Design a protein with these regions (language model features):
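N-terminal loops that bind phosphate or other acidic moieties
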Residues: 1-308
């Protein structure tokens, strides 16, 4: 049996490559031939998923985090000349410091500028996992134009107008701060043309700022799977999943896109926790104990190989 192990990350527990390795270990122990192809939807870790699938070279840059502290960040140059830049590499969300009214996306702009200075053929910008809610104002202070074609992998569909109420609380905003963010966003007249653009709310409004510069906002999971050349043909089994399977898993998340593209092939979706079974696909819950996530995935892979 040929199996494709293509999980997304179990956030805060296992990165997607480690989850894929654990699944593949179990599949091989059960006698299957297994290939590892970790997946992502545009958030943190997307560049590494693409590097594993396509190759490429990491580049380093000195930038500033969301609160103007110096940090080193890296971006990925793919073999075809595309620069892959993650917002979370520069201005990551830090649960120990949540201040959405003060956080700036300037550091992400610095990282994008560093990638552009290297002369890439194109940009693939990955949005998600940031501390920022500044509608991309910091980015726009640094990057005035995109000199090459740019695609943006977004892990949400929310618009700029919706972002404060949806994402503000995740980044530490209480009701008063959400109201202030809504006021600030409303005053950004230069963003009026992209205020209601789907995915413009990604990464605290970075999507809208990039759309203003002419970048194309795309569903992250589909974009990443296309770039990684996901193809289930020739496999007898596809195994995917994430930390929590719920009603949103089928709505643009990476495992949902894997399952959709695997129609006609036996597909199993796992969840560290399963709130809602994935429609029409065998759904398996792990133990739910983060400390045992890796061994759970090894055991799942072995069981799937032995029982099919």
């Amino acid at each position: 049996m040929r199996a494709l192990a293509c999980p997304a990350s179990l956030k805060g527990v296992l990165a997607a490559p480690l989850a894929a390795a654990a699944l593949a270990e179990g599949l091989r122990a059960g006698g299957a031939e297994a290939r590892e192809l970790p997946v992502a939807d545009g958030g943190e870790g997307t560049a590494e998923v693409l590097r594993l699938a396509l190759g490429g070279e990491w580049r380093e840059a000195d930038v500033h985090d969301a609160f103007a502290q110096p940090r080193s960040a890296r971006w990925l140059l793919l073999p075809d000349g595309t620069a892959v830049v993650e917002s979370a590499a520069a201005v990551p969300l830090d649960p120990e410091r949540l201040d959405p009214l003060a956080a700036s996306s300037r550091g992400f702009g610095e990282l994008v500028a560093a990638a552009l200075a290297a002369g890439p053929e194109a940009l693939l910008l990955c949005l998600g996992g940031t501390a920022t809610m500044d509608a991309g104002a910091g980015l726009l202070d640094v990057v005035g134009e995109l000199s090459v074609p740019a695609r943006v992998a977004c892990d949400v569909t929310a618009t700029l107008a919706e972002a404060p109420s949806i994402f503000g609380p995740q980044k530490g905003a209480g009701p008063a701060e959400v109201a202030e963010l809504e006021r600030r966003f409303a005053e950004l007249e230069e963003l009026d043309s992209v205020r209601h653009t789907p995915r413009g709310g990604a990464a605290g409004g970075l999507g809208a700022a990039l759309a203003l510069l002419g970048a194309e906002l795309l569903p992250g999971a589909a974009l990443v799977l296309d770039a990684a050349r996901f193809d289930p043909s020739g496999y007898d089994l596809v195994v995917t999943g994430e930390g929590r399977v719920d009603a949103t898993t089928a709505l643009g998340k990476a495992p949902g896109e894997v399952a959709r593209r695997s129609a006609g092939t036996c597909c199993v979706v796992f969840g560290g926790v399963v709130d809602v079974a994935f429609p029409g696909v065998e759904t398996v819950a792990l133990s739910g104990d983060p400390a045992h996530a890796r061994e759970d995935l090894v055991a799942l892979g072995r069981a799937l190989a032995v029982n099919r």
